[in-house]
């Protein structure tokens, strides 16, 4: 038997309704904030992620699904969404549009070759938001407010917003030099990844899952001590907006995020529930990226965004015992007796569906009792039984499955009968 690839999942019908519910809620919330949907290819040029995400990141070095096409071009299944959205922004010259900043959101599968664990898949679904074309603390605050709005709208509690500033390029240069000086004497005691990052991306040592509890990490210089005046001012204004919005947050000077393009504001939304086992601690993450557009040969413009995992959102809802109202009303089940009735029912249900009525029938030649059980399984509001007598009399009994009451209706009026009930 051929099975699904390791690190993937089948979303079965009983679960796909939850996915649709979440995605519809997210689409609705985006309309409130005036964000428009963008759809980019599932695969892109490998160079896009090597340059945009960063050569020294785990994503580029270890996790990308890269292949050569028949034209010997190197392509990669997208591991994240921001680089592709920025590429599209540049390619289609959106910077020339009058409605700046350009507010975009996306939703779709991403691919990373990660070790299988709870809450992580090699194909995972990511919903993300990007606001490009404005460097203003208020748009950072809007993004953070949106993150809280999304998760609170599902009824989640135990949320902890963690923020930091990693400054501009000047601040980061000074900070990286301080980190190299701090870690160099003890780097031999760190993992091989940290050793390779020391001179390429020393900030990532602070984020290492293996060594982050070491004393050298706990005592490392703090980015906030190296922020220049502009970076400090920007960060303080973001926090003032959050205070004004009554959004609680925790500052973590070691929060650096895993991708190279972040500047200034960086953040994660965590689940802060002591009953969790820690496997799905981070629900969402993002930040500002002021140099990414130029890095990809675009204009000197800035952006900010975030991404969340639908899988982790579903797990968090399950952990907190929050059920989604995904019950689906089904209008009518047609029970048939005999070939003539079945032939009539095929045309009838086609007419009903063309008029917006959710309707189904039996296709396995079940007896009446079996067909009625199928109607119950579908939670059909109504059933009708069509046999030779009903066809001869041009009249049918419509049974309300909730009240148990029945009403006789002319067969040729059945479509109008159900249309009138849908419109109420």
From Swiss-Prot:
It comes from the Bacteria. It catalyses: tRNA(His) + L-histidine + ATP = L-histidyl-tRNA(His) + AMP + diphosphate + H(+). Its EC number is 6.1.1.21. Transmembrane segments: none annotated. It is found in: Cytoplasm. Coiled coil: none annotated. GO terms for biological process: histidyl-tRNA aminoacylation. GO terms for molecular function: ATP binding; catalytic activity, acting on a protein; histidine-tRNA ligase activity; transferase activity. GO terms for cellular component: cytoplasm. Keywords: Aminoacyl-tRNA synthetase, ATP-binding, Cytoplasm, Ligase, Nucleotide-binding, Protein biosynthesis. Its main location: cytoplasm. It is an enzyme of class 6 (ligase). It holds the Pfam family HGTP_anticodon. Belongs to the class-II aminoacyl-tRNA synthetase family. Homodimer. This is Histidine--tRNA ligase. The lineage of its organism: Bacteria, Bacillati, Bacillota, Bacilli, Bacillales.
């Amino acid at each position: 038997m051929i099975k699904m690839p390791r690190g993937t999942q089948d979303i079965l019908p009983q679960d796909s309704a939850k996915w649709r519910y979440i995605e519809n809620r997210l689409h609705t919330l985006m309309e409130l904030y005036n964000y428009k949907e963008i759809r980019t290819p599932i695969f892109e040029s490998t160079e896009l992620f090597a340059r945009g995400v960063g050569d020294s990141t785990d994503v580029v070095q270890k996790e990308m699904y890269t292949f050569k096409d028949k034209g010997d071009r190197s392509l990669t299944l997208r591991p994240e969404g921001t680089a592709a959205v920025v590429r599209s922004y540049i390619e289609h010259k959106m910077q020339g549009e009058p409605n700046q900043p350009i507010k975009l959101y996306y939703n779709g599968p991403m691919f990373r070759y990660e070790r299988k664990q709870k809450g992580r898949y090699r194909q995972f679904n990511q919903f993300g938001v990007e606001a490009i074309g404005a460097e203003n603390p208020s748009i950072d605050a809007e993004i953070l407010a949106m993150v809280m709005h999304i998760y609170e709208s599902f009824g989640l509690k135990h949320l902890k917003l963690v923020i930091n500033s990693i400054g501009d390029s000047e601040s980061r240069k000074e900070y990286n030099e301080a980190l190299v000086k701090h870690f160099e004497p003890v780097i031999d005691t760190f993992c091989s990844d940290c050793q390779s990052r020391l001179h390429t991306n020393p900030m990532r040592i602070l984020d290492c899952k293996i060594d982050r509890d070491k004393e050298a990490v706990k005592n490392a210089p703090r980015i906030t001590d190296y922020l220049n005046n502009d970076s400090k001012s920007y960060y303080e204004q973001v926090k003032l907006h959050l205070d004004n919005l009554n959004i609680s947050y925790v500052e973590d000077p070691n929060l650096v995020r895993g991708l190279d393009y972040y500047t200034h504001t960086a953040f994660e939304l965590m689940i802060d529930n002591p009953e969790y086992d820690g496997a799905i601690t981070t629900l969402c993450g993002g930040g500002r990226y002021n140099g990414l557009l130029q890095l990809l040969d675009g204009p000197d413009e800035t952006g900010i965004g975030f991404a969340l995992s639908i899988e982790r959102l579903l797990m968090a809802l399950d952990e907190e015992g929050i059920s989604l109202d995904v019950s689906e009303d089904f209008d009518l089940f047609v029970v048939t007796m005999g070939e003539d009735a079945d032939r009539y029912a095929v045309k009838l249900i086609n007419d009903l569906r063309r008029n917006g009525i959710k309707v189904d029938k039996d296709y396995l030649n079940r007896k009446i009792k079996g067909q009625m059980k199928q109607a119950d399984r579908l939670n059909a509001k109504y059933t009708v039984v069509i046999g030779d007598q009903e066809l001869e009399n041009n009249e049918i009994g419509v049974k309300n499955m909730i009240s148990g009451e029945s009403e006789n209706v002319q067969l040729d009026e059945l479509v109008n009968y159900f249309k009138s009930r849908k419109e109420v």
